[in-house]
Amino acid sequence: MGAVSAKYRRFARIAWGCAVRRVTFRPCDTTFKQDLKDHLLAPIAVRTPRLVKPASVGLEVVAWLVILTTVWSGYTVVKSGLNLYVYGTCNKENAESCTLGAEACAIPDQTPTFWGSIAEFDVIGAFGNEFASLGETISQIPTRMQNWDATEYLPANETYLATFDEAKPTALEVIDPGCQFCRQLFANIEEAGFENEYNLTYVPYPIEGEDGYKFPNSLLVTQYLEALRLSPADDGAGTSGADTEPAVAGDTGTPVDWQVLERIFTGETDNGVPFQSRINGLDTDAATALLDGWLTEFGLDADEVATIKSVAASDEVADIIAANKELVEDEIHTVKVPTIIFDGRRHDGLVDVDGLK
């Protein structure tokens, strides 16, 4: 009020002087509170004396609300800043809601929100979850300064987009086959020639939602990818030379799981619809038939396709997917997909072409 009204500027100067003394741990030697209250209540006392007491109470309530709002706003700014530094998003519970970070598909936090808990009259839980979340963020600050080595986070039976070269550094990306930003990252990787400079591998991570998965067929595609990684092949191109090597079909020397990803991320239907959008809109049976057709197109025979389909539904693949979930959430600690680790850094969200060069 002091900024726009001359009659309140005296109070503004007194208030700032008092604030400075408080910050420097000195007593506030002014009757500012009472002076301001008297100034505001004087017109009411003249016109309607009986309203002075309730108006005084109202001023106290408003004053406390202003204080609480200021404190909460300051806390929110600090928390958002820490989240932006650590996770690349000002809201780690819903990374997509923050426009300051890189574009990404959010990994939702299943913990009840502060106001959600308040609405359920769980005050203790609201503050407990809030400060636990802040504590977790603070504990992750060192990860922004650490040297990230992609080889320390490799999944089981990893495959590589190009032929593995021990002379090249390794890069690891966390992807959800249904996430549109993973598709954009793949396009940027190809445009930058990233796979020619790094041994690029991936962790398939289907993002869970409140009811099932964020993208309906992400789990199905992930099951097929892991089954393909488990399937033996005579050709070791695109692998690190593990005992169990993934299927490699055709003349490209590219593992079939990568061929599936490339089809999803870069291919289109005859009508020009991206295959990723197509798969996201299909029911399970139709998506399964589409994947089986691709495997046949990539050179697998009927028996091999049947084997892949069986392995995809196995407990072994389920265990691998569970291990990948733990890897992403508890070791990599990202809240955004895609996430890519290379050159000693963890990059959360979509990385542009220049950032990949």
Q: Model regions: which residues?
A:
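Extracytoplasmic thiol/disulfide redox context detector
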Residues: 80-219, 240, 318-333
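C-terminal cap of thioredoxin/glutaredoxin-like
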Residues: 285, 289-357
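Cytosolic juxtamembrane regulatory segments of multi-pass membrane proteins
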Residues: 24-40, 98-108
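Structural alpha/beta surface segment adjacent to cysteine/selenocysteine redox centers
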Residues: 183-296
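Membrane-interface motif at the C-terminal end of an N-terminal transmembrane signal
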Residues: 4-5, 68-86
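Loop-to-transmembrane boundary segments
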Residues: 35-69
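Active-site-proximal beta-strand/loop segments in catalytic clefts of secreted hydrolases
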Residues: 174-175, 203-206, 263-265, 343-345, ...
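Hydrophobic alpha-helical segments
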Residues: 1-28
